[in-house]
Regions:
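Nucleic-acid endonuclease domains
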Residues: 1-24, 29-126
Length: 126
């Protein structure tokens, strides 16, 4: 709900994504450990845009990253030395990998928004 508020999306309480932006399906993935995450994706996940939410518990701040990926782009991400996410999905598996280490860091993706939870403020970072 916080990310929907910050980004102006409608919270999707039904199936198919976490939020909607017009006719676009938005998927949120999040972690509460600043340095490490293990994120999983279902074998049949379909969305138009993936956002990653990263909590800085020490400072009560939530950072929002726009990965720029849709479900097709995400399928090209290498989740180990020999397989992409799509390879594992085709096997009916639920791939798990670090969004921080496999998407954000290699692509130098910076946060677009910061939510200061204590002060109840949304700050644009771009």
């Amino acid at each position: 709900a916080l990310a929907c508020y910050a980004l102006g999306f409608q919270w999707n309480k039904g199936s198919g994504g976490d939020a909607v932006d017009g006719n676009r399906i938005i998927e949120f993935k999040a972690c509460s450990n600043w340095d490490l995450d293990t994120t999983s994706f279902s074998p049949s996940e379909e969305f138009d845009r993936l956002y990653f939410l990263r909590l800085d518990k020490r400072n009560d701040e939530l950072y929002i990253y726009d990965t720029g990926l849709d479900s097709d782009g995400l399928k090209q991400v290498k989740v180990n030395k020999t397989q992409t996410l799509a390879d594992q999905q085709k096997m009916g598996r639920r791939p798990r990998f670090s969004v921080i280490n496999f998407i954000l860091k290699p692509n130098m993706i910076e946060p677009i928004k910061k939510i200061n939870i204590r002060e109840k403020k949304v700050i644009d970072l771009w």
